[in-house]
């Protein structure tokens, strides 16, 4: 393991402590969050979906839980059973659709609060789970520095929004710089 070379009051360490208090310790989890009024616009939602889908393509990533791939339980009255659908199918095309998604998420899907959204802070979050086998290897650092950070920066440049990122793999990589 790597020694923490940063002081306890360093912003990176403080952010990590806040992350642990809120989400607990998950050694392979990276959490990304947006906290801007522009989150629920078609442009930003679609770019957030693209970001999530891009991350899913990497072999270093086991799973990505984001607004676009949330399983939603729906009653099929004809078959008399429940089926699951994705929360967002395809592209968000209108502001009315974006507003509706926000309303459904915050009012009808409370079990996703804290994982995908935070109603109090108006944040939208994505959980990225790295392959546990690489968390303690150079492959983690290479992925974070050469793939993850550039993809996040591209999103930030395209939208003008700041992505808040935390989690053990991310913090350990930045701390080792």
Outline where the language-model segments fall.
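Membrane-proximal juxtamembrane linkers immediately C-terminal to transmembrane helices
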Residues: 11, 15, 20-28
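Extracellular/periplasmic ligand-binding regions of membrane signal-transduction receptors
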Residues: 26-40, 85-86
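Extracytoplasmic
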Residues: 17, 23, 46, 91-177
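Charged, often glycine-rich, active-site loop that binds/positions anionic groups
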Residues: 24, 49, 75-92, 176-177
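Transmembrane helices with small-residue packing motifs
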Residues: 1-11, 34
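Short amphipathic beta-strand/extended segments in non-transmembrane regions
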Residues: 32-35, 49-77
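Conserved, well-structured beta-alpha core segment at the onset of a catalytic domain
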Residues: 11, 24, 36-51
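Short beta-strand/turn "edge" motifs
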Residues: 30-31, 66-86, 108-123, 127, ...
């Amino acid at each position: 393991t790597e020694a923490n070379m940063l002081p306890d009051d360093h912003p990176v360490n403080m952010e990590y402590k806040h992350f642990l208090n809120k989400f607990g310790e998950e050694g392979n989890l990276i959490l990304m969050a947006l906290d801007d009024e522009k989150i629920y616009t078609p442009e930003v939602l679609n770019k957030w979906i693209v970001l999530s889908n891009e991350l899913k393509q990497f072999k270093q990533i086991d799973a990505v839980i984001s607004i676009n791939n949330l399983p939603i339980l729906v009653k099929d009255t004809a078959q008399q059973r429940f089926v699951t659908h994705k929360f967002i199918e395809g592209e968000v095309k209108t502001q009315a659709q974006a507003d509706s998604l926000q309303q459904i998420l915050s009012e009808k899907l409370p079990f996703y609060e804290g994982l995908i959204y935070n109603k109090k802070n108006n944040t939208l979050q994505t959980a990225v789970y790295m392959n546990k086998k690489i968390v303690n290897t150079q492959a983690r650092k290479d992925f974070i520095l050469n793939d993850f950070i550039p993809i996040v920066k591209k999103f930030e440049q395209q939208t003008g929004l700041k992505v808040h990122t935390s989690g053990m793999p991310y913090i350990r990589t930045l701390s080792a710089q």
